[in-house]
Amino acid sequence: MGHGRRATDSLTPVRNLDDILKAYDVRGTYPDQLDEDLAHQVGGAFVRALGIATRDGGAGAVVIAHDMRPSGPSLVASFAEGVRGQGVDVILIGLASTDGLYFASGRLNLPGAMFTASHNPAQYNGIKLCKAGAAPVGQDSGLRDIRALIDAGVPAYDGPLGEVREQDMLADYAAFLRELVDVSGSRHLRIVVDAGNGM
């Protein structure tokens, strides 16, 4: 990831976002409505809108995950470059459910981005954003500001790039889920699980 775009100012501002900026997420078909350039700009605008601390001004970071959609890894990489270009570190937790990303945001106390389009078909993808502690980002809590920054062109950042690291949160998340239910007194059951494409 170290050889990506330096900053967001090299991109043409994206217009006509009305169809993909929903109440609580960004969602559209890939690559017609949501592509790598837009993901890059959303990453930079997310950092700016939330005022996430840069490497030379604190210890800010964004945790990012994606579901099983084929476009996920490429969109995540571009979003991460947008975040890095604004001087903020990136923590990649890889393939995860939305609840898994929210758990990571809460456990690490960091803002997060989940690449998913929920129930929509595979040609769709989207970005659910949250503040530190898994507080949702909606139109009235950041999305409108992100839209304004993208429309105007995300300002360039001249400080050092953020760094990227991977972190496995699955074991911690599984332990957290097991703590929610006391199975010590449960009778023997046979359970069938539909893993939903692994998610």
PLM features per residue range, with description:
Residues 5, 9-79, 85-86, 166-189:
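An N-terminal, well-structured beta->alpha segment
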Residues 24, 66, 116, 193-196:
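Active-site flanking residues adjacent to catalytic metal/cofactor-binding acidic residues
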Residues 27, 69, 120, 134-135, ...:
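Short, glycine-/Ser/Thr-/acidic-enriched flexible segments
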Residues 27-30, 96, 128, 198:
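Gly/Ser/Thr-rich beta-alpha loop segments that engage phosphate groups in nucleotides
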Residues 55-132:
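Ferredoxin-reductase
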Residues 125-199:
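Gly/Ser/Thr-enriched, mixed-charge loops and adjacent short helices
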